[in-house]
Amino acid sequence: MILDDLVAVTKIRLARHQRQQSLADLKQTVAKMPRNHKPDFLTRLKQPGLHVIAEVKKASPSKGTIVTDFPYLAIAKAYDQAGADAISVLTEPDYFNGHLHYLKEISQQVSVPTLRKDFTIDPYMIYEAKANGAVIILLIVAILTDQQLRDYRQLAEKLGMHAIVEAYTAAEVTRALQSGAKIIGINNRNLKDFRVDFNNSLKLRAMVPDNIPVVAESGIKTQEDVEKLAAAGFNAILIGETLMRSNQKRQLIAAFKERA
């Protein structure tokens, strides 16, 4: 399964990073960071309308290289100027061609919150996200225990961050809710085989109480898709490949927000 492979390579990368910089040193780096003055992500999600999380992504396990020309800073700035509410940055290198320095540079250059899009399996990675400018992390229910879901979210909040707790099945939505998640992501992509079912998020939306913001992820391609998700009561959409392949990124974000 692809997800198992992703977790395996993440463990190897984590061990390498821990050898390069200890957790104690990383905590010191985080402690010295200036206060974040970007808009609060959770507060923004609770405002009316459908919010857009625009993703900076060069490749994926299912599609391989999505774009060969990858001016990541220019892309992120275009998202920001187009009115994206947050920017997701892939930092997983082996399957997504991501890198932490993309996150750090983008976080320094945009006015909106940034999300570290990676496979968080250890508290070290949360401190690492913070040190590189992220104010949002992703917690994937399928790869974490109930205790980890709760502990990692609470650590993120202690550091002034938010966590999107991502689910794919009804059982995972239940676990996300039981963990105390304050933002839930419903993925249309099965991370075990990377197949996409757009209707997955529509089917599971009703499980989440209206007081908890919900993000629809993956397989969102058209304005009709966006309208369906808005009508279903989603608070936000995360769009990656569709934006990355578009030559009119600003116009596409503006159109999605307008039609929603």
Curated annotation (Swiss-Prot):
Recorded GO MF terms: indole-3-glycerol-phosphate synthase activity; phosphoribosylanthranilate isomerase activity
Catalyzed chemical reaction(s): 1-(2-carboxyphenylamino)-1-deoxy-D-ribulose 5-phosphate + H(+) = (1S,2R)-1-C-(indol-3-yl)glycerol 3-phosphate + CO2 + H2O
Protein name, per record: Indole-3-glycerol phosphate synthase
Keyword Transcription regulation among UniProt keywords: no
Alphabetical UniProt keywords: Amino-acid biosynthesis, Aromatic amino acid biosynthesis, Decarboxylase, Lyase, Tryptophan biosynthesis
Superkingdom of the organism of origin: Bacteria
Lineage: Bacteria, Bacillati, Bacillota, Bacilli, Lactobacillales
Enzyme Commission code(s) on record: 4.1.1.48
Native source organism of the sequence: Lacticaseibacillus paracasei (strain ATCC 334 / BCRC 17002 / CCUG 31169 / CIP 107868 / KCTC 3260 / NRRL B-441)
CDD domains listed in its UniProt record: IGPS
Keyword Amino-acid biosynthesis assigned: yes
Similarity-based family: Belongs to the TrpC family.
A single BP term in Gene Ontology: L-tryptophan biosynthetic process
